[in-house]
Amino acid sequence: MSSGISKTAKGKRGRPSLQQVLQQLDEEVSLLKTSMGGLPRAVEANAILHEIWIDDVHNSTAIEGNTMTRAQVEELVERGRASASLVEMLEVDGYAEVADWVYRHAADYQGVPVTVVSEAHRRAVELVWAKQPPASRDQPGAWRKTPVQVGKVVVSVPAAIPAELDAWSASTRDPKGRHPVVHAAVHHAWFERIHPFVDGNGRVGRLVLNFMLLQHGYPPAVIAKARRPRYLHGLALADDGNVNVLAEVIARAVSGTLTRFLVPALAGEARLVPLSALAARGPYSSAYLRLLVFDGKLKAVPDGNLWLSSKKWLQEYMRDRDPRGHKSLSKRRKKK
């Protein structure tokens, strides 16, 4: 089987290729492992994982049409109440429960057993289906017994689902030389083509995607609702054998989890982190920080394709500037 990356794929002008995106992601993950001890375990970093979890629950359910805001999702999972419809709250509750389990237990498995897929679906939809059962009367966690039409995609016929899921599950355990993100992308698209349930395949598919990523030492991919069109485009291209766009969407989502949540939370003020992580919790964009580095105004050190700086060095730069970005009067006077 091929690597899953199209040999003809090249980055458009001004847009990095998939290989470049994966290389940068691996450098970020390597930095996390070597400088910060790797991914925090749930018992060690509940606060960090909690923020990722909320973001994951909100965006993954929103991709499927749930209209609850992130603030409403947070209020529901933390306090058990929110101003939203009952069905939408049940959707969020179900997904939140399974995502929490995935974060804590993915590393306990090798690959994705079909029993995990079935149990993830059962937990994700049973409350919703108790209130609003599907017309087919399928049961939560059970493979569908009726044909479905999913746009122009040809999905598995019901009789073929058990055997195809067995083959899919066995394949999740063997990357076959693929990059872990590409391996996860290939199996995410494959799972959606099998479409084993009458409803809930998208949510379960993204849970399984993160299950695989976590097994390989990557943080969860939180695919933002705003990225839905490109994500669906990537799935459509993957159905035709080109997984590049889908893998890029996933890689960028993983990188976003790193730079927005993990690295800023784990890094002390003197810890060197990528400029993107420094920008995630600061007043400047990563592009502006890069300009400051090239101008010699912000201390930084190169590390492969990345530039690393620290909160401490950024604070030193900011102390040397007034709010308008000019050097302070006291500093100018000292130079006279």
Residues covered by each model-derived region:
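FIC/Doc superfamily catalytic core
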Residues: M1-D199, R203-K336
